[in-house]
A protein has these predicted regions:
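Conserved Rossmann-like nucleotide-binding pocket used by diverse enzymes
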Residues: 17, 33, 106
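Residue-level signal for beta-strand positions within conserved beta-sheet cores that form or flank
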Residues: 20, 50, 101-103
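Sec-exported extracytoplasmic/periplasmic mature domains
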Residues: 35-45, 59, 79, 94-98, ...
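C-terminal capping alpha-helices of c-type cytochrome domains
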Residues: 83-128
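C-terminal segment of classical bacterial N-terminal signal peptides
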Residues: 7-8, 14-22
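Electron-transfer interface patches adjacent to heme c in soluble/periplasmic c-type cytochromes
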Residues: 43-45, 56, 60-87, 107-117
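Bacterial N-terminal signal peptides that target proteins for export
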Residues: 1-9
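Sequence/structural segment immediately N-terminal to covalent heme-attachment motifs in c-type
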Residues: 25-49, 54
Length: 128
């Protein structure tokens, strides 16, 4: 009986965690989180700063924004099939230099999952 309950609980947790960020997060709070990003990134297509523009980032192959010089590591990740979606972006933003060793991004990462959820909600809205 205990094993059945434990297995059921594990399955439920996995199901909830696999839902993703599509409907989670607060756009207004995500905009505040984006303040940490906007020193290096814009939301305007083709307008890059230290980092690439995030306009149209979801569904884009890593290292492929036009007119931006990406690190070899980011280009290699893209060539290996990395495409930005809510899950890959969230994993990257937790620990960028661990997720893609050799990335030029110096940001240490967001530590709180709620910050990432809110940022994903904002970016999905702002980069349509």
């Amino acid at each position: 009986m205990k094993k059945t309950l434990s297995l059921t609980a594990t399955i439920a947790i996995l199901a909830v965690s696999s839902i993703g960020y599509a409907n989670a997060g607060d756009v207004a709070k995500g905009k505040k989180v984006f303040n940490k990003c906007k020193a290096c990134h814009t939301l305007i297509a083709g307008k890059h700063r230290i980092g690439p523009s995030l306009a149209g980032v979801f569904g884009r192959t890593a290292g492929s924004a036009k007119k931006y010089k990406f690190s070899k590591a980011m280009k290699k990740a893209g060539a290996g099939g990395l495409v930005w979606d809510e899950k890959t972006m969230a994993a990257y933003l937790m620990k960028p230099r661990k997720y893609i060793k050799g990335t030029k991004m110096t940001f240490a990462g967001l530590k709180k999952p709620v910050q990432i959820e809110n940022l994903m909600a904002f970016l999905k809205e702002a980069t349509k």
